[in-house]
Amino acid sequence: MSYGLNIKLARESRGITQKELAKLVGITQVSLSRLEKSDSIIALPLIEEIGIALHYPVSFFDKSFDDKELHTSLFYRKRATMKVRDLDVINRRIQIINKAVDTLLDAVEIPEFSIPAIECTEEYHADEIAYRLKRYLQIPSSPILNIVNAIEKCGVIVCFLKIGNSGDKFDGLTTFTSKGYPIIYLNDDMPNDRKRFNLIHEVGHLTMHMRSENLKKSEEEKEEEANLFAAEFLLPRATCITDLSNMRLRDLSELKSKWMVSKAFLIHRAKELCCINENTSKYYYITLGRNGEKKQESGYVPIDRPTILNKMIGLHLNNLAYSMEELSDMLGICSDEILELYGTKMKLSV
């Protein structure tokens, strides 16, 4: 038994067209279209076929999902570079994970959300907000090793999401679940230096924009503010200015290792702080490109893995003694995708 809205949600989360799904389950596209628009009860054998085709347990189709449009930090500049179908896949997957998170949190407590909402104004710039937020959260001005842990301590759930081919242009986004829990989703296929930057970029949106009542500010302005916020958060002016002053090309690898940001971002920040001039920054960027480092830089940057989702799932499997089958039924997600959210760093003891 099920409702059509969930069939559409499941189908779009897999990037499958009506025609493709209809062929997989042996019905006409017209019949499937009617099913997706219907509130009528659907026969169990057909739902089982659809579940197999879309890789969802039967319980998924009985869940009640919030059908309102997701309020996220995915602003126009990012949307403009992505195909509509790819965006739909990401949004639907996030909608499904958000529901699972809310369900898990019925039995688990996480740190209280403690990041304040701060309005960015002409008098109160994004870099000043980043500086004050770090002081408020007692995050040191030195390079931040366990940066994900520092954000999760503030009650923000971080999720490294495996996107695949549909999300090569997707960096990350911030959203709230139906019950009001903030989640930052990041593309797990990105290099770690980009993950670190995009994490703090999203914290900037969460601080300055996601709860703002200012409807006049353009999305381009918001992106610029989030970039400036991330720059000050990751490379604080007062601390990094000595390292970036008269920065030479040969310094980039060492500074990347120290500050755990990309070489391109170091060049950008050095120019932003007037530590190097326009011509020097252009020369550095060109040299990176010639060395094949425009898309994939040399030099390893570490990043810690998110732990809140891992612990939430682990508590259900271990402390609350759910079997994987029971958890899959409760969340409406297949076991392999639960394990993906659980993370591969820890062994599953069930």
Please tell me what each predicted stretch does.
Residues 1-350:
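Active-site hotspot residues in diverse enzymes, especially metal/ion-binding acidic/histidine motifs
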